[in-house]
């Protein structure tokens, strides 16, 4: 039995020439918290907690009262054609952003292997390089580059996916 891509994968395949317009999650080694944009499913605004966020340049100003949320992202694996749901807790929510920021440090603290060195900088690159892998799963997420930023495509999951997909 041959697995067929789901509708989200079909859309991604048909839009190969316009990769930049697809929602994505970027690795950000300077962030100390996960930052989620508009393409996530917020399932809990933690007791209406907020915080003020200082940017890398103090002259830009502080983002005031940024909500802290629990939310989910969907990842459509191009190899298995399965959709995985990533649950992110205590994340900053900035809905004006079209992408998400994920600190590799936080992935590593959770026991997830994050190799953020691009393959062009590896002596003998393999599938393990420039990827995110999970110790208790066969899932491996290959990373891509947008300029110098490593990223992978994610999107807002549907209600049905929240209930039925692997987390």
Describe these PLM feature segments.
Residues 8-56, 89-103:
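Aspartyl protease active-site motif detector
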